[in-house]
């Protein structure tokens, strides 16, 4: 499950505004019926309409960055209800959706779409060489 990087996310890494190790990084589960990605224009979580946000994870743990490849422990979305999940996006959580920078987007995982049923949803990152994403 290799993700595409948002242009502004890439800019954030290069400008030193995103610190993979120190920053709070979360994952938003997305209903694409309410969001059309603009990989180079979308910048902040606020660019993903609230109606498209099916669930948000806790902060990523056990983050790694060897050789420019981002990795982390698998994610659990808890007690998810609502629309089908057709995509996910990683973002730097500042506590304010207007400044929480989007990092990566994935709508091509073999695990998608997911139909929530009120239970937990496990998101397992790719164990291969590209893990979550590669800079």
For the regions a protein language model found, what residue spans apply to each?
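Small cysteine-rich, disulfide-bonded extracellular modules of the LU/uPAR three-finger superfamily
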Residues: 1-86, 93-135
């Amino acid at each position: 499950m290799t993700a595409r990087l948002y242009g502004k996310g890439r800019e954030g890494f290069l400008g030193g505004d995103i610190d993979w190790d120190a920053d709070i990084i979360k994952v938003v589960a997305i209903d694409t019926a309410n969001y059309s990605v603009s990989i180079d224009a979308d910048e902040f979580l606020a660019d993903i309409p609230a109606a498209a946000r099916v669930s948000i994870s806790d902060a990523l743990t056990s983050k790694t960055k060897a050789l420019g490849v981002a990795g982390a422990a698998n994610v659990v979305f808890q007690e998810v209800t609502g629309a089908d999940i057709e995509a996910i996006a990683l973002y730097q959580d500042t506590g304010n959706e207007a400044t929480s920078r989007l990092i990566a987007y994935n709508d091509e995982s073999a695990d998608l779409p997911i139909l929530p049923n009120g239970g937990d949803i496990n998101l397992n990152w790719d164990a291969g060489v590209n893990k979550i994403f590669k800079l």
